């Protein structure tokens, strides 16, 4: 159980939430674990198979406390809301902001700043921890290039300009990503991003990680009451969860890229986990995907201190916290959207 931003998170799959007077009671195997006064909550997000009692769901609906139900793996399932306090006002503000270049740019600026900041920190972390095994000069040059882009991002007032700066930062970052790979260079060498299809094992894992992260971000946005299909940086396209792609930008370097690098550098993955097709495409096979998912779930259970909130939580909660912060900004509770800055 974790209470953050006036949101109660039930993170264990066997937690059952019930109502007792004015309190939410968390139970496991009919044993009471904790109590939370209803009047202190704005929303409840449950990742439990056990879920919530009908009485609690009804009282939350009466009081306008949003309830989101997700699977233990983070897939959004359903939402409970009352007659008059759904997400219409929040979504109307989201749509208004998405239609306004300046409003969209204000949010996108923060997200791109977070992405470049985290990309640079990933490079600096490798320099610090493995300085004798890498080309320090190449990493330093890339780090400086990205650092010089950060104030430009904060000053940029157009979405196209932000996309250009993001592209420059990505070129600098991916230009040295191979330096961050420390083991099994024969199988896991990186010569640049290739998509649709990925042409080497590193790109196969990056693409797979991005697709999982996008799914997690879409579920987090749904749970926060936002429309994952209407973004600020990524514009509308049928079937594309544009806001999920926006939200994951700042999380790519620290959640997806570092995860892939850890799998490689810890020798978790090897050549037999991939299929090489006649077209040149390289994909994870069934065993590789199962292994990937297992370690991804382990990663999501690892702990960290959220840099903005100063609270300890699991990595898997980060997209949900960022989605809640974005919703708070759109409601006018925050002056700006605070991106996740990895430290």
Can you say where each PLM-predicted feature lies in the sequence?
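Terminal-proximal segments
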Residues: 1-72, 82
């Amino acid at each position: 159980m974790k209470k953050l931003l006036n949101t109660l998170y039930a993170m264990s799959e066997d937690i059952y939430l019930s109502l007792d007077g004015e309190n939410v009671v968390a139970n496991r195997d009919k044993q009471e674990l904790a109590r939370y006064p209803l009047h202190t909550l704005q929303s409840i997000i449950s990742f439990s198979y056990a879920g919530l009692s009908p009485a609690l769901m009804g009282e939350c609906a009466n009081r306008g406390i949003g309830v989101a139900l997700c699977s233990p793996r983070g897939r959004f399932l359903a939402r409970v809301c009352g007659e008059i306090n759904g997400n219409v006002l929040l979504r109307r503000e989201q749509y208004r902001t998405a239609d306004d270049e300046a409003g969209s740019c204000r949010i996108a600026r923060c997200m791109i700043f977070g992405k470049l900041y985290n990309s640079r920190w990933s490079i600096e972390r490798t320099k610090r921890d493995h300085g004798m095994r890498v080309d320090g000069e190449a990493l330093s040059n890339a780090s400086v290039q990205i650092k010089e882009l950060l104030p430009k991002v904060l000053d940029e007032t157009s979405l196209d300009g932000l996309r250009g700066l993001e592209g420059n930062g990505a070129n600098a970052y991916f230009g040295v990503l191979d330096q961050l790979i420390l083991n099994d260079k024969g199988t896991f060498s990186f010569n640049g991003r290739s998509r649709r299809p990925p042409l080497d094992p590193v790109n196969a894992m990056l693409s797979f990680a991005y697709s999982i992260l996008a799914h997690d971000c879409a579920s987090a946005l749904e749970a926060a009451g936002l429309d994952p299909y209407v973004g600020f940086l990524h514009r509308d396209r049928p079937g594309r969860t544009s806001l999920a792609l926006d939200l994951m930008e700042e999380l790519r370097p620290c959640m997806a890229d570092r995860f892939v690098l850890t799998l490689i550098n810890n020798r978790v993955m090897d050549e037999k986990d991939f299929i090489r097709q006649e077209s040149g495409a390289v994909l994870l096979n069934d065993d590789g995907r199962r292994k990937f998912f297992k370690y991804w779930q382990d990663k999501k259970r690892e702990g960290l201190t959220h840099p903005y909130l100063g609270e300890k939580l699991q990595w898997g909660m980060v997209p949900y916290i960022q989605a809640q912060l974005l919703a708070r900004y759109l409601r006018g509770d925050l002056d700006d959207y605070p991106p996740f800055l990895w430290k």
